[in-house]
Amino acid sequence: MIRFLHGADFHLDSAFGALPPGQAAARRRESRELALRLADYVNKYGVDLVLLAGDLFDSASPFRETGEQLAAALGQMRARVFISPGNHDWYGPNSPWETVNWPENVYVFKENTLTAVEVPERNLVIHGAAFTGPEQPESLLAGFTAPADGKRHIGLLHGELDGAEARYGPIRREEAAASGLCYLALGHVHKRTAPLTLGRTVCAWPGCPEGRGFDELGEKGGLWVTLDDGAISAEFVPLARRRYRIAVSYTHLRAHETSQDLV
């Protein structure tokens, strides 16, 4: 059995521009604590791997302190960590993926093509790739098929499935179905999705782990994924410290109206 945590879209150092400056600064500080909560969870429940599918930073040039804090938190995890940078935190020579000293248990994919990293103790291979600019119009999964070598193959990418906008790593359904991956860990979509099976590949987005505004409502977190004898399950893990909600008053609801009329 293999157990891993799938997360994405932390967007550390977001501006929180809708808030007053003091509150925005407080929210940024709180956001940096997310990785520490994640580390506590990983160590408490014995996760084997952590897969982070991009946009951990809100830009490719966050405060150095933020990168160092994230690296320190990931270094506390008693698990191997894999990261595929996305369109906000794309890899470049001056990005935190190059300038921050990442701990030994963290592997950052830096190539714009799929790279394979073996996890021999788990008979597992992780395939990942990085955005190397703010846009990625071509699919990073195009033409890929995992070898039939008896190992379990997992993909880690930032992107969208059948996206109308072909700018952020669009992946076609037929590419996922032909990939031979047992699981495709995705980022970019901030709303958690139910696992989708294409061919033999299970695809999922965990959504963002912390809402940043009223366009990101409800519970937020990551996915606890279990691979056991070919069976794959993905369960939601709440991680958010705060939750955005919209309150609706029914005080002035008229007799012919329903609650849906107010929403």
Positions of the model-derived regions?
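His/Asp/Glu-rich metal-coordinating catalytic cores
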Residues: L49, D58-A204, C208-E219, T226
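N-terminal active-site segment of His-dependent metallophosphoesterases
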Residues: M1-E68
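Charged, glycine-rich active-site and insertion segments that engage polyanionic ligands
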Residues: F236-Y250
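Short hydrophobic/aromatic beta-strand or adjacent loop that forms the aromatic wall/cage
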Residues: K220-G222, Y244
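Short, charged, solvent-exposed linker or helix-capping segments at domain edges/interfaces
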Residues: F16, P137-L140, S233-F236
